[in-house]
Design a protein with these regions (language model features):
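Soluble periplasmic/extracytoplasmic beta-strand elements of cell-envelope proteins
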Residues: 107-109, 119-129, 159-163, 189, ...
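Short, low-complexity, glycine-enriched hydrophobic/amphipathic alpha-helices that associate
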Residues: 24-91
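C-terminal motif of bacterial Sec signal peptides marking the signal peptidase cleavage site
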Residues: 17-21
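Amphipathic, membrane-active segments
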Residues: 82-116
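Periplasmic peptidoglycan-binding/anchoring modules of Gram-negative envelope and division proteins
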Residues: 97, 129-163, 191, 221, ...
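Bacterial N-terminal signal peptides that target proteins for export
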Residues: 1-11
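Periplasmic OmpA-like peptidoglycan-binding domain that tethers envelope proteins to the cell wall
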Residues: 165-238
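Short, solvent-exposed beta-strand/turn patches at coil↔beta or beta↔helix junctions
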Residues: 111-146, 167-173
Length: 241
């Protein structure tokens, strides 16, 4: 009973519209404190979420539930997440091929969440989603996002956190706002394609956690991106235990 109560507290904390007071976010580095968090309709992220942004640096996405998950359950969840990731990789590979020479920064990789469960990280370069300086999805964005929405709808026991990033050009306030607006635009597109709002969350990180140097145009282009973390939801974890 105590375990379930602790899990419920973690879920409520993550689902808050402005969760900066939650313990899940206390591991943010100094620059991460400038990030903006957006609320999904229904308050989104559930038990399995907790991947670290930036490959081990930065902000916790969600709550740690620790010993509530055994090794056997972790293996079962890993099998399901591997299958979902492979399906998503195949779908998005078609987008790369169809796009030809256009900027098609699309990366699908396996990551771990804070509970050491397998999760999926999708990286989308801003050039395939938005026009420069805009938070309005471009027509080209449909090709990738429609496939991600389909994948999420086919795997209803997973949750997704959408995180927007910018380069360091311009003011911090502007970049924080733009990154959140872009994350929300992607989240709202997924909702429009039938993904339940209760499974989704959006967050803006601004120029935090760059993946390349902002000293060059190529590096800044890499830093302007949207990342989508797909993790095991509460029901998937319960079913696996």
């Amino acid at each position: 009973m105590k375990k379930l109560r602790n899990l419920t507290i973690g879920l409520l904390c993550v689902g808050m519209v402005v969760p900066m007071g939650c313990s899940s976010f206390k591991s943010m580095n100094k620059s991460g404190q400038n990030a903006i968090v957006g609320g999904a309709a229904g308050g989104a992220v559930g038990a399995g979420i907790g991947a670290l942004i930036g490959g081990g640096k930065g902000t916790w996405i969600g709550a740690l539930i620790g010993s509530a998950i055994g090794a056997g359950a972790g293996a079962a969840i890993g099998h399901q997440m591997d299958r979902q990731r492979e399906e998503l990789e195949q779908e998005l590979a078609q987008v790369r091929q169809e796009a030809g020479k256009r900027d098609t920064t699309i990366i699908v990789e396996k990551v771990k969440d804070s509970n050491n469960l397998d999760a999926i990280k999708v990286v989308l370069g801003d050039a395939i989603l938005f026009n420069s300086g805009s938070a309005t999805l471009s027509p080209a964005a449909d090709a990738a996002l429609s496939r991600i929405a389909y994948n999420l709808n086919q795997n209803p026991k997973t949750y997704a956190t959408v995180i927007g990033f910018t380069d360091n050009t311009g003011s911090l306030q502007l970049n924080n706002t733009l990154s959140l607006q872009r994350a929300e635009a992607v989240m709202n597109y997924l909702i429009s394609q039938g993904v339940l709002a209760s499974r989704l969350s959006a967050k803006g990180e601004g120029p935090n956690n760059p993946v390349a140097s902002n000293a060059t145009a190529a590096g800044r282009a890499q830093n302007r991106r949207v990342e989508i973390y797909i993790t095991a939801g509460e029901q998937m974890i319960k079913d696996a235990q």
